[in-house]
Amino acid sequence: MGRAVGIDLGTTNSVVSVLEGGEAKVIANSEGSRTTPSIVAFAKNGEVLVGQSAKNQAVANVDRTIRSVKRHMGTDWKVSIDDKEYTAPEISARTLQKLKRDAESYLGEDVTDAVITVPAYFNDAQRQATKDAGQIAGLNVLRIVNEPTAAALAYGLEKGDKEQTILVFDLGGGTFDVSLLEIGDGVVEVRATAGDNELGGDDWDQRIVDWLADKFKASHGVDLTKDKMALQRLREAAEKAKIELSSSQQASINLPYITVDEDRNPLFLDETLTRTEFQKITQDLLDRTKTPFQAVLKDAEISVDEIDHVVLVGGSTRMVAVSELVTELTNGKEPNKGVNPDEVVAVGAALQAGVLRGEVKDVLLLDVTPLSLGIETKGGVMTKLIERNTTIPTKRSETFTTAEDSQPSVQIQVFQGEREMAAHNKLLGSFELAGIAPAPRGVPQIEVTFDIDANGIVSVSAKDKATGKENTIKIQDGSGLSQEEIDRMVKDAETHAEEDKKRREEQEVRNSAESMAYQTRKFVEDNKDKVSEDTQNKVEEAAKAVDEALKGDDIEAIKDAVEKLNAESQEMGKAIYEAEAAAGAEGAGADAAGSAANDDPNVVDAEVVDEDTSAEDDKK
C-alpha cells in the first residue's frame, strides 16, 4: 500500500502535505517552493506545463494557459486546445498529478491515497468534480474535506483537550468561507458554515487590472483589455501589487513596452497604487464577506464573545483590510498569527488522511453539509429533506404521493440551496420512478431517501411502498462525467504522463549532447599545444556530427553521435596523458644525470674558494 497525502487544491496555488512521525510536513515541489501555482499550460511543442513553469510562460502563450479552473468545477465548462476539449476536472487533475509526482520524489515511494480539500460552500456538483479530478490523476480519494474544517483540525489539535470555539475565516484565490467549529478532547465538530463561491483574491486582482486599464486609456487612448498579452501582463502586475500592498503603503507598477500607438511607437505603463486607493476600489468586495459571517453566528446560535480563537486561512487574508475587518467583526479579537494561511489547510488534510489510515488516533471529525437538499414538489416548491449545517454523514427519508389520478410514474428532481422555489436553487440531477400501480392521486406512497456520505456527496433513492419498485441516483451531474469518461481520462492522463516523461528524457539527452560538444571544444582550445592536428580534426568532426544530430528529432542518432564524440575525447585524453608522461620521463632522466655527477667524490657542493684568500692563508 502506497502513502497517503493531504492536498489543498486551490484556485491560485495548491499545497501537498504528508504525515511523518505523527507530524504533518509540507512537501516542497520540484522547483523548491512549498506552494505550486494552479496553472496548466499546453506548450506549442505538445508539452504540458504545470505550476511555476506554466506561470512563467503565460504572457507569451495566453490562449493555451489555463488558470483559476477551480471556479469552473461542477459546471459544463470546457476548453479546446489543438482540437481537443478538456473539462475542469481534467485540468485540475494535471495539478494533482504534479503534486503527486513531487510527493513521490520526496518520499521515494508511491503515493496512492489522498484527502483533498474543497471550500466549505462547494455544492454537491463541485465536490463530485473534485473527486473525479483526483481519480483522473491516479489517486484514491479517501475523503473530500472542507477547507475551514481541515484548518481547524491542524490548528486545534495543538490546543489540548479544553473545549474551544474557533472561527475560521477562509478567503482564497477564488472562494470565501467562514466556519464556526468546536474543538475539544480530540473531536472537531463544525457548528455552522457559510460562504460565497464567487468571491476571492482573483476579484481583488481584477479591480487593480480595471484600474490600470482605465488609467492607461485615459492617458493614451488605448484599451489594453483588447490585447491578450497586455492583459496577461496587467494580471501579473496586479497580483504583485496586491501582495506588495500587504506590507507597504504603496506599490509602483511599471510595464515597459506594454503596447504601441497608432504610429507603432512603444507605450509604457507607469502608475503608483496606494493602499488607500486599493481599499477604496475593493471596498464592496470586502463588504460581501460580512453577510456569511453574520449568517454563521446566527446558524450556530453563538455570540461573538463566545469565540475563543480566530484563524485566517488563504493567502488573500494577508491583505491589511481583511485582517482589520475580521478584528472589527469579532469585537477586537486579534487573528492568530502562528498559522501559515497558505499551508494550514494542506496540513489538516494530511492529518485527516492519517486519521482515515489509522495513523492518527483519537480524533473525530464531524463536518456539515453547507446547503439544504430537497426535491421539487407540486407548484415548483422546494421541499427540503436535509437542512443546511446538518452533521454528515446523514440519511433522511420522507414519504410523498402522486399529484394526478392513475399517475404511472414520478419524476424526482433533486435540488440544493436555500430558496423557497426549486427553480431558484441548483439542480443536482433527476431520475424517474416508473411502474406505479394505477390509483387515485394522493393514494400511492413514495418514500424518498437522501443519503450524504462523509465527502458531502449525495445519493437519492425513491421507492413505491406498494410495489416495492425502487430507483436510485448518485448525483454525478457535478462534473458531467460518466465512469466510462473518467476511466478514459485516467488512461489519457497516464499516457500524457509517459509522454511528458519521454519528453523530459529527450530534452536531457539534448542538453547533455550540447554541453558535451561545447566542453570538448573548449578543452581542445585550452590544450592545442598538447594535441596533434590529426587528433584535433577527429574530435572536431565528431563534435560537428553531434551538432548535426541535434538539428533533427532522432534521439538515438544524438546518442550515437555523443558516444562517438566521447570515444574521440577519450583517445585525445589518452594521447595528452601519454605525451605528459613521456615529457615527465625525459625530465626525470635529466635529473638523474645531474644526480650522477654530484656523486663524484672530488666534487664538493656549494663550496666556493676565493683565490686571493687562499694565497693569504698560504702566507700564514
Curated annotation (Swiss-Prot):
Biased composition (Basic and acidic residues): 492-511
Gene3D superfamilies linked to this entry: 1.20.1270.10, 3.30.420.40, Actin, Chain A, domain 4, Substrate Binding Domain Of DNAk, Chain A, domain 1
GO MF annotations, alphabetized: ATP binding; ATP-dependent protein folding chaperone; unfolded protein binding
KW Nucleotide-binding (keyword) present: yes
Keywords: ATP-binding, Chaperone, Nucleotide-binding, Phosphoprotein, Stress response
InterPro entries (alphabetical): ATPase_NBD (IPR043129), Chaperone_DnaK (IPR012725), Heat_shock_70_CS (IPR018181), HSP70_C_sf (IPR029048), HSP70_peptide-bd_sf (IPR029047), Hsp_70_fam (IPR013126)
Start-end of Acidic residues biased regions: 607-620
Entries under SUPFAM superfamilies matching the protein: Actin-like ATPase domain, Heat shock protein 70kD (HSP70), C-terminal subdomain, Heat shock protein 70kD (HSP70), peptide-binding domain
Compositionally biased tracts (Low complexity): 583-597
Pfam families (alphabetical): HSP70 (PF00012)
Function: Acts as a chaperone.
Protein name: Chaperone protein DnaK
Species name: Corynebacterium jeikeium (strain K411)
Gene transcribed to yield this protein: dnaK
